């Protein structure tokens, strides 16, 4: 639901300000304070016990004046150290967070700091050591924070001596919290956090309620569902000052486990019950908490009844989060039940639920600043009735089924972020968008919007604009961008737009993300890109550019991560890519007219696509840089030649390599076999020769396509023993000889096996029925795409390979072949013997081609079990005997070729088999029956049930038909008017009938909604 303010921060800030005021600390006065020698030595001794790998204590000891050391503050009058603050700041520069922690032990030398009142050692690593007992002797402490610092053991009982303590934070350690008796001595304590430890204190409620000044209590992740206070303890509780209560992640499943909190109805202002397991209706008693301002119920299992009507009493509520609670409720009703807080509510989180209906007039909530409604079932309109001007600053309606036009957006002049993506909005983006002067993010992606107004150009604060995947039409000119000086992220992907700007146009922005695929920007290369110096992503694919690559384009920004110029008609040479400062690069220049030698590949390249161009010459330059980060390389369909260099062992992360359709020669490099992460290898249609090197280490390999080369030798046994993940194996059009190894039958995931056009001999293995996928009748195969890893949000870069296969007697290339095709092709070899009967067990097979071999014997009798078979080619063999009757059961069969064998007898009668051309059966001298000549002496069977008098039979049929239709009309007339007449005459019947219909309609509607909501919830969980 976005970044939220923790109430604890207000308390801490307030406490720190009080400390600063009380001790009169200013940086200017501290600098004049003289350090006390004894305390300086104590601090240096404390430093010696720590490991400072990040130099955070580098100032300690550089000068005599310890009051100027980092993290130290002294009293301006006495010089005593009063503040020791060594907490680590957590930063998240990328996708991982980092903190420069201190490690080691806490030295008892701190006892020399007798006047210390502020100690913060949080977010460090004290190596599972116990909290030093001597800290309990620092009696002047008012602030103690040891959270997230890897302390273990029990909390020292000596903490009872810290009677001046106002803030105590021991959260997120490995502490064992057994006894809290010491708490009752801390009469000044206002803030207590014990969450995220091994909580075992059964007496927790009794002891905590003895702390008279406690205002904020954090017991998150304490497993409190196991320690429910007794009714007697609750009745005797006297904690009347408690204002803020954090109970997140305690495995509460019913309200009875936290009902004690309603005893503090006169003081509680903030409650956090998020991330529990509450699965029933929300407790009505929340409505009795008259001072409640902040309520977080997010991420629970279910709020069956939605927002209860008692919430109308919460007139001070300004924050409510019910996101991801499986709330099923009509949205207008929900807003009605919150009407009591319409003047106070500022933040409302309802995302990830099953809310339905339209967006009501939210402008009635005059203080509402943030509204989260994404990922629901909203299926109506956006504000059917126009209201007053709204104070909303953040609105997210994405991932719903909202429809209709957008309202007048001028009603939301304070909006900073507007997320409307993944809906069904239609029409034009309203002109009023130009009046949202504070708007920073505008996302209308994945809708059906058609028009983009020029008023967009007035949004001087707009930073991100995403209108991708709509049906936007027309021409974009400079006017659409005239004042977008803050814009850094522009996404107009996959619309019907043309970008028409002056040749010398200089945009007012400096973009970081440029996504304009399928926008018509041609035919010239857009010169305004020369003015952009900071982009990390540039995608102008499918932009209808037919131009030479300009010389200035080689000056790419050093921040560049992703470059996509694919599917244009750009020509010219690419000599070298800029060396990016980033950890990785993705370059896609595919489907253009680039020529020349292979450009020098950047060392940080992760995805590199040059396929479908006119590059030529050697690719030896690929070895000049160690491109160990590369995960996917596609150089296919160019004019590269020569031997492929043997340097692939340095690309240990490579998952996809496609070198197909080039003029490579020589041997397949041995180092390819060292790529343990390789999933797909395409080297078909080259001139590789010699033996195939071992790929036994490539145990993740799913596609091995090496067809159309001059490889020799036997099919290696390691294919069957080590490549157990194979889904496609294509060795077609090579010079392999010997028999098909039976070990190949261990490839249980295999969907396509193509060994055609080789010199294979021997018998077909009888174990082909071990191909598990090919035995399954139900379902299609898996997709042939690979989600190649890379570090750019929103996720993986999809690589979809293609495959050259013989399908229905035609050689074709298929993308995503595995979604549908299940094929065995052993044609054009020298195989002998019979067709194994086990082959009929492959009931999921769609194409079987055994043609052009020397197979003998009969056609397998059980072939009729292969119900999904669409193509069967057994031609040009030595097969004999009759065509099995079961062949007539193959209703999907559209290609059949049994020609040029020694088959005999009559072709089985069926609509399917007789529909094929004569050529499907030709070359079988003893075969007869349609579509060939009829067999000699054949007489069609007589229908013994036929009538000897056809005319009489026809008359009977005519009479029966007439009688049937007359009776049907009379029956309908009597029944219809009988029921309708009763309803007209009898009013009570009429009312009952229509009430029944209305109730039935409502029941069906609500039942379907509830079932859908529950199913949606289960899928999310």
UniProtKB/Swiss-Prot annotation:
Q: Where is the signal peptide?
A: 1-24
InterPro entries associated with the record: Leu-rich_rpt, Leu-rich_rpt_typical-subtyp, LRR_dom_sf, LRR_N_plant-typ, RLP23-like
Say where the protein is mainly found: membrane
* Subcellular localization(s) per the UniProt record: Cell membrane
Record-linked Pfam families: LRR_1 (PF00560), LRR_8 (PF13855), LRRNT_2 (PF08263)
Topology check: give the Cytoplasmic ranges. Answer: 985-1021
Q: Where are the transmembrane segments?
A: 964-984
Q: Which PROSITE patterns match?
A: LRR
The record's function comment reads: Involved in plant defense. Confers resistance to the fungal pathogen T.viride through recognition of the EIX elicitor protein.
Subunit-level organization: Interacts with EIX elicitor protein.
Annotated family: Belongs to the RLP family.
Name of protein? Receptor-like protein EIX2
- State the gene name recorded for this protein: EIX2
């Amino acid at each position: 639901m976005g970044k939220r303010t923790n109430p604890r921060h207000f308390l801490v800030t307030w406490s720190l300000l009080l400390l600063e005021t009380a001790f009169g600390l200013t940086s200017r006065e501290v600098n004049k304070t003289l350090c006390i020698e004894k305390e300086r030595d104590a601090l240096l001794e404390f430093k010696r016990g720590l490991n400072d790998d990040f130099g955070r204590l580098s100032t300690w000891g550089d000068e005599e004046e310890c009051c100027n050391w980092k993290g130290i503050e002294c009293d301006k009058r006495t010089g005593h150290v009063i503040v020791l603050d060594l907490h680590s700041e957590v930063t998240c520069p990328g996708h991982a967070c980092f903190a420069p922690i201190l490690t080691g032990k806490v030295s008892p030398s701190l006892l020399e700091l007798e006047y210390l009142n502020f100690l913060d050692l949080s977010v460090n690593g004290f190596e599972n050591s116990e909290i030093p007992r001597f800290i309990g002797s620092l009696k002047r402490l008012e602030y103690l924070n040891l959270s997230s610092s890897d302390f273990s053991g029990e909390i020292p009982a000596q903490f009872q001596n810290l009677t001046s303590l106002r803030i105590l934070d021991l959260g997120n350690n490995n502490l064992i919290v057994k006894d809290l008796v010491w708490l009752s001595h801390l009469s000044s304590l206002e803030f207590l956090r014990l969450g995220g430890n091994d909580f075992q204190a059964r007496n927790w409620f009794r002891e905590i309620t003895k702390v008279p000044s406690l205002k904020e209590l954090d017991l998150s992740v304490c497993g409190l569902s196991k320690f429910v206070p007794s009714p007697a303890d609750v009745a005797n509780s006297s904690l009347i000052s408690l204002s803020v209560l954090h109970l997140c992640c305690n495995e509460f499943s019913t309200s009875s486990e936290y009902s004690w909190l309603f005893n503090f109805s006169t003081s509680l202002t903030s409650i956090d019950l998020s991330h529990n397991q509450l699965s029933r209706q929300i407790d009505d008693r929340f409505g009795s908490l008259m001072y409640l301002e902040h309520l977080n119920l997010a991420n629970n299992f279910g709020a069956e009844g939605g927002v209860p009507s008692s919430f109308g009493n919460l007139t001070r509520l300004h924050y409510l989060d019910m996101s991801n609670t499986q709330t099923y409720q009509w949205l207008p009703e929900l807003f009605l039940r919150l009407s009591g807080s319409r003047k106070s509510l500022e933040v409302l989180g309802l995302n990830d639920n099953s809310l339905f209906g339209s967006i009501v007039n939210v402008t009635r909530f005059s203080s509402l600043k943030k509204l989260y409604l994404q990922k629901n079932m909203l299926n109506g309109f956006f504000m059917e009735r126009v209201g007053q001007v709204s104070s909303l600053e953040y609105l997210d309606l994405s991932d719903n089924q909202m429809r209709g036009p957008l309202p007048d957006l001028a009603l939301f002049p304070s909006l900073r972020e507007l997320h409307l993506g993944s809906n069904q909005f239609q029409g034009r983006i309203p002109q009023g968008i130009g009046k949202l002067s504070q708007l920073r993010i505008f996302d209308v992606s994945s809708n059906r919007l058609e028009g983009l107004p020029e008023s967009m150009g007035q949004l001087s604060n707009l930073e991100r604009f995403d209108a991708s995947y709509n049906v936007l039409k027309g021409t974009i000119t400079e006017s659409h961008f005239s004042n977008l000086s803050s814009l850094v992220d522009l996404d107009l992907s996959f619309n019907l737009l043309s970008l028409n700007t002056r040749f010398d146009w200089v945009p007012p922005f400096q973009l970081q993300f440029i996504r304009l695929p399928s926008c018509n920007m041609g035919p010239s290369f857009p010169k305004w890109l020369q003015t952009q110096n900071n982009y990390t992503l540039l995608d102008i694919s499918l932009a209808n550019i037919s131009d030479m690559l300009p010389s200035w384009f080689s000056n790419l920004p050093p921040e560049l991560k992703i470059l996509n110029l694919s599917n244009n008609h750009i020509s010219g040479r690419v000599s070298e890519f800029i060396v990016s400062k980033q950890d990785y690069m993705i370059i896609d220049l595919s489907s253009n007219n680039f020529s020349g030698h292979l450009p020098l590949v950047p060392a940080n390249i992760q995805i590199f696509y040059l396929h479908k161009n006119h590059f030529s010459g050697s690719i030896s330059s690929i070895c000049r840089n160690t491109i160990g980060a590369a995960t996917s390389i596609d150089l296919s369909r160019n004019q590269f030649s020569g031997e492929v260099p043997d340097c692939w062992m340095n690309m240990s992360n490579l998952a996809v390599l496609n070198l197909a359709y080039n003029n490579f020669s020589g041997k397949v490099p041995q180092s390819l076999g060292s790529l343990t992460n390789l999933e797909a290898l395409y080297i078909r249609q080259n001139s590789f020769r010699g033996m195939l090197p071992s790929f036994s280490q490539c145990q993740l390999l799913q596609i091995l396509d090496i067809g159309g080369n001059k490889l020799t030798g036997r099919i290696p046994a390691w294919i069957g023993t080590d490549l157990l993940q194979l889904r496609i194996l294509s060795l077609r059009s090579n010079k392999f000889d010997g028999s098909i190894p039976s070990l190949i039958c261990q490839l249980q995931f295999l969907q396509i096996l193509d060994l055609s056009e080789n010199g294979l001999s021997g018998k077909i293995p009888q174990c082909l029925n071990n191909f598990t996928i090919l035995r399954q009748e139900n379902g299609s195969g898996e997709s042939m795409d690979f989600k190649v890893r890379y570090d750019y949000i929103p996720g993986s870069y999809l690589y979809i390979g293609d495959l050259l296969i013989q399908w229905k007697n035609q050689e074709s290339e298929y993308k995503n072949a595995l979604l549908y095709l299940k094929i065995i092709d052993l044609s054009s070899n020298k195989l002998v013997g019979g067709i194994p009967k086990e082959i009929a067990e492959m009931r999921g097979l769609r194409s079987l081609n055994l043609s052009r071999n020397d197979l003998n014997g009969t056609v397998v009798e059980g072939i009729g079990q292969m119900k999904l078979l669409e193509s069967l080619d057994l031609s040009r063999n030595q097969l004999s005997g009759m065509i099995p009757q079961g062949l007539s059961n193959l209703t999907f069969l559209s290609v059949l070729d049994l020609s040029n064998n020694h088959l005999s007898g009559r072709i089985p009668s069926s609509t399917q088999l007789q529909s094929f051309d004569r050529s499907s059966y030709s070359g079988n001298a003893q075969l007869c029956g349609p579509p060939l000549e009829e067999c000699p002496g054949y007489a069609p069977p007589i229908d013994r049930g036929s009538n000897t008098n056809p005319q009489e039979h026809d008359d009977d049929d005519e009479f029966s038909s007439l009688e049937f239709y007359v009776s049907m009309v009379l029956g309908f007339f009597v029944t219809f008017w009988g029921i309708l007449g009763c309803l007209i005459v009898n009013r009570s019947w009429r009312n009952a009938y229509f009430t029944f219909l209305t109730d039935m309609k409502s029941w069906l509607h609500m039942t379907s909604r509830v079932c859908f909501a529950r199913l949606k919830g289960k899928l999310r969980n």
